[in-house]
């Protein structure tokens, strides 16, 4: 069966989990690229795959069917189901690829792309909140907030006013045209890219989901487990970096303390990747969409 989506940093993910025996949670199963490669590379691995996209779930069930009981697939948001998985499985690894798949971007009816005919952007097609709802019903202050927080857009107020003035906005292309008139031009990417990112994050509550996953891992501290997270923009990467940094701290005394009184034995594990791993030149030539991908890995103590 032809894979519709190239998994990013695949070799680096395989390297991260090559010594694992037991359950790997693929928190963003998607079209099964990372999971299939992990199953092929290591007969001692079992996969629990999670995704909220029903199209991706159907594809991955078929793609991974030959692996039988080595694979369990759950439909849902990873932050909502990870707690139960950590309680019921011997989790030896967690992988999360926090991004939109190529297929989601390329399918115009999903509304993720600036070239889409509609405004949707829901990863879970059954969810109530869509990009259309955000763009056409949020007030000016709400729009300004998500543009500033999730897109780090400097002209968030001006953009919010323009969107409200042009309502109703029916398509992604119409929204992109409005953004193009307001936002500074960029040689590398379309001016509307960060706007679409901000709306997508709001629709899918992506940062809340990421924080929920990390908080659950911190609570359960799965012994010896490796956590590998791929991010595609600075907001997500900052969250992962900060959590890993806090987890690796031995001393938790307040900064103003003159000397350590906590015992300096509070580290949950160690950061495996001192700097984020990025795509190789060869991968970028084959898959330009990997250009902004960053992989960070943490390992909990035994």
Curated annotation (Swiss-Prot):
Family statement: Belongs to the methyltransferase superfamily. RsmH family.
EC assignment: 2.1.1.199
GO cellular component, as recorded: cytoplasm
GO biological process: rRNA base methylation
Gene name in the database record: rsmH
Pfam families xrefs: Methyltransf_5
UniProt KW S-adenosyl-L-methionine keyword: yes
Protein name: Ribosomal RNA small subunit methyltransferase H
Molecular function GO labels: rRNA (cytosine-N4-)-methyltransferase activity
Keyword Methyltransferase: yes
Protein localization: Cytoplasm
Organism whose genome encodes this protein: Nitratiruptor sp. (strain SB155-2)
UniProt-annotated binding residues for S-adenosyl-L-methionine: 32-34, 51, 78, 97, 104
Catalytic activity: cytidine(1402) in 16S rRNA + S-adenosyl-L-methionine = N(4)-methylcytidine(1402) in 16S rRNA + S-adenosyl-L-homocysteine + H(+)
Purpose: Specifically methylates the N4 position of cytidine in position 1402 (C1402) of 16S rRNA.
Keywords on record: Cytoplasm, Methyltransferase, rRNA processing, S-adenosyl-L-methionine, Transferase
Enzyme class, broadest EC rank: transferase
Taxonomy, superkingdom: Bacteria
Xref: InterPro entries: RsmH, SAM-dep_MeTrfase_MraW_recog, SAM-dependent_MTases_sf
């Amino acid at each position: 069966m032809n894979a519709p989506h190239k998994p990013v940093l695949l070799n680096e993910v395989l390297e991260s989990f090559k010594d694992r025996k037991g359950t790997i949670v693929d928190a963003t199963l998607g079209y099964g690229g990372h999971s299939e490669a992990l199953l092929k590379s290591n007969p001692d691995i079992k996969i629990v795959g999670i995704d909220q996209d029903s199209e991706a779930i159907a594809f991955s069930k078929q793609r991974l069917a030959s692996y039988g009981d080595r694979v369990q697939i759950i439909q849902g948001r990873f932050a909502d189901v990870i707690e139960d998985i950590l309680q019921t499985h011997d989790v030896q690894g967690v992988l999360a690829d926090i991004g939109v798949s190529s297929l989601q971007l390329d399918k115009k009816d999903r509304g993720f792309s600036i070239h889409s005919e509609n405004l949707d952007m829901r990863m879970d097609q059954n969810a109530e909140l869509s990009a259309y709802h955000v763009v056409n019903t949020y007030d000016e202050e709400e729009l300004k907030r998500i543009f500033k927080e999730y897109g780090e857009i400097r002209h968030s107020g001006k953009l919010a006013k323009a969107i409200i003035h042009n309502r109703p906005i029916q398509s992604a292309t119409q929204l992109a045209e409005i953004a193009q008139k307001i936002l500074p031009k960029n040689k590398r990417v379309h001016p509307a890219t960060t706007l679409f990112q901000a709306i997508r994050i709001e629709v899918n509550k992506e940062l809340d989901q990421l924080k929920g996953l990390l908080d659950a891992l911190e609570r359960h501290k799965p012994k010896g487990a490796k956590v590998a997270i791929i991010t595609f923009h600075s907001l997500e990467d900052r969250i992962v970096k900060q959590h890993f940094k806090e987890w690796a701290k031995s001393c938790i005394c307040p900064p103003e303390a003159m000397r350590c009184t906590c015992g300096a034995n509070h580290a949950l594990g160690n950061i495996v990747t001192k700097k984020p791993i990025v795509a190789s030149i060869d991968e970028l030539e084959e898959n330009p969409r990997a250009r902004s991908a960053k992989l960070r890995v943490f390992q909990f103590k035994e």
